[in-house]
Amino acid sequence: MFTMKKSMLLLFFLGTISLSLCEQERNADEEERRDEEVAKMEEIKRGLLSGILGAGKNIVCGLSGLC
């Protein structure tokens, strides 16, 4: 009986460690995905901003005739 309790306790302990490691890995994956999404959004914002600035320069250049 005592040996069975020890082995069950050991299995519980190892299962808890395994679960904890899986949870940490999942959290790291989610954080990595969030970082990738933020990077994509920043790229899109930069692209839109440069497009707007380029169009603004063309308008000013066309209206003033100084280019």
Swiss-Prot record:
- The record's disulfide annotation reads C61-C67
Give the GO cellular component terms, alphabetically: extracellular region
Q: Which Pfam families match?
A: Antimicrobial22, FSAP_sig_propep
Q: Does the keyword Secreted apply?
A: yes
Which residues are processed away as propeptide to yield the mature protein? Answer: 23-46
Protein family per UniProt: Belongs to the frog skin active peptide (FSAP) family. Brevinin subfamily.
Q: Which residues form the signal peptide?
A: 1-22
**Top-rank taxon, per record:** Eukaryota
Q: Which key words are in the record?
A: Amphibian defense peptide, Antibiotic, Antimicrobial, Cleavage on pair of basic residues, Disulfide bond, Secreted, Signal
The free-text function statement in the UniProt record for this protein reads: Antimicrobial peptide active at least against the Gram-positive bacterium S.aureus but with otherwise unclear activity spectrum. Lacks hemolytic activity against rabbit or human erythrocytes.
According to UniProt, the tissues expressing it are described as: Expressed by the skin glands.
* Keyword set includes Signal: yes
**Localization of this protein:** Secreted
Q: Which organism is it from?
A: Odorrana grahami
Q: What is this protein called?
A: Nigrocin-2GRc
A GO BP entry: defense response to Gram-negative bacterium
